[in-house]
């Protein structure tokens, strides 16, 4: 216990000690280095950086091969940049939530700090983040953008070590890096400077958030620099589960070297964090798209999670069972080590190389919704399909609370939900090598080789339906009944109705190899680029075969009479596909402050271990998902206006639909379909007078499904009957047709500094749950605010809040129910936004 307490304290103590030493060093060296250009960024300088990120002079390095990057005015693609200060002003709840600053990006952050579903306008995702990649210093964090129970923002945390982010949509990303056809967020780290400098901040929030952040950059020797920083925090969460909802931190360090001909940066990061994975709560549906609170359940602050169901034993987990803990949530223990090297070889030759090694555990401990709730009596003695009732002989059952408290009232509302545990161990190594040659004035040819090898070791325990009260901080319930004089146990002593429906172990291994060529040609005001890529993915996945067994040999313990168990044999699937991608873009600079562009690209989305290999046989895996994208844009800036507008037409084919049951088991045949989308994205700002600015991020999407002439079979929740629906022409699931954010801000200067106040109004238009479009999720509007005070050169005070009006808005309903998810009583399980959250940060810059 003592060692555990020391380990919990080690990270915040380490950060505090490093920053204390850094502050002393900064004071000691200020006088001796006064003649050097100061590296310390005061609050005012940080504001200047933020302003520059919203101009066309901002240099971006993502999505192009230009030495040193390209100015935004020269890029023939859509890219959003944000400085460290702008990231904070966006007040993101998580890494994924930050993506909302990019028009057309739709992160569903209602699941908590991690595990977000990330949608991109016109890219038909529907869950996880198949068309989104996270990069650190230009290197993808994992070889595949998503797996079941994993998307790459889950292994990345925002803190004061992040210098800026570049968010690229479509365009040239199909050729460079991991060849992502959708969107890529590239996070760049702060590095050391000539003058020791840094910051330390503390944050307190109304959900009992306590957080410390810090960064320190320093010189080591001539042209050698180092930095270290990180964060530690704990929080009860807006939805208090009766244990720490978020707890952990990370530590990041860099070592960099500058020379006359190039630069080198090495970086390392250790992340150890655990976060509550928030699951749907009950609501009442009125009509097709209006919702209100379920009696006794606050949809903004309540959760089923509780101390009573926190610790469980899962006998069906592969290898003989395991203990699991809800407090571990969607946890991450991950290590990173990478480096960037850029060198001018002379005579027009330039070399660039990026590598990253990372690995660790990304486990999930969470409740997953299944059937709707009902009374204890109806659950026991009816066959109502919407609640998964037991249909026991009348008067035969005994239902009592697991942790004492006597018998359960027959009128008590109850529900059974899956207590799922997924252990996921990932490893990844990647390298992106580029060699460029200036062929003649204005023309540069780049050849690149991208290699990555990555593995996945999983153990799943899906199902584990636990009977519990349908109340905030639920209590588990155990049930037995008498049948012909024999006592039968419907649940075990923990309240489990079963020991899993899908208890698999799997090991995946893959290698991707890609060669690409890119030519960039500047002719006066024209900038033309043409790039091509050929990529091969060679992957295998071994999944244990399951046999249903009676774990204890007792036919009267119904919960374990048919437990899917790995039987020692494996299904091996191999996936070996090669596909070319290409992109062509043309940018024309109309004036120093204005440009237009057009771009076309075609790319492919390779299959992953879970969504292409598992459940399929070698040679019979789904086809590649292919996209063709056409876009055009206009960029303009002046003292009064800033505008970055793009229009697009995106077409998909090769999409697959695989139905699953309430326990997560794949059922039925896969179906193929496509999509067709047109839309407009806008990022802009108006500055009508000094110190006032109105910023806008907006998108309009007209997207629908295509190329499926069959119908999708599903079970109607109300009638229990099997029905069929066609999806051609239906709105892309979970993507709002219209979304916009308006942020007016006003800065008031004083002799001692300044105060900036802003509010953000967000409108999210109508959106749907799945391909059927039968379950509407409605629309909603939110208000956020912020007040930032910069005091002298060294202090910053920040007060910010989200969802200040406690708006009830849904991003997801019950993912295990296809079609309408509301029962005859209008009850629906869904994930609303969290309620009002306010936090205060005090930061010292040195």
Question: Where are these predicted regions, by residue range?
Answer:
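Gram-negative outer-membrane beta-barrel transporters
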Residues: 525, 642, 649-651, 671-771, ...
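Extracytoplasmic beta-strand/coil segments of soluble accessory domains associated
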Residues: 48, 62-64, 68-71, 76, ...
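N-terminal periplasmic accessory domains that precede
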Residues: 95-98, 117-121, 135-137, 152-155, ...
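C-terminal beta-signal and adjacent terminal beta-strands/loops
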Residues: 4, 29, 653, 690-693, ...
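Membrane-embedded beta-barrel scaffold of Gram-negative outer-membrane proteins
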Residues: 352-356, 589, 595-601, 623-690, ...
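Short acidic/polar hinge/loop motifs at secondary-structure boundaries
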Residues: 140-169
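Short strand-turn segments of transmembrane beta-barrel domains in outer membranes
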Residues: 184-219, 228-241, 760
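Acidic/polar loop-and-plug regions of large Gram-negative outer-membrane beta-barrel proteins
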Residues: 245-247, 251-258, 263-336, 363-424, ...
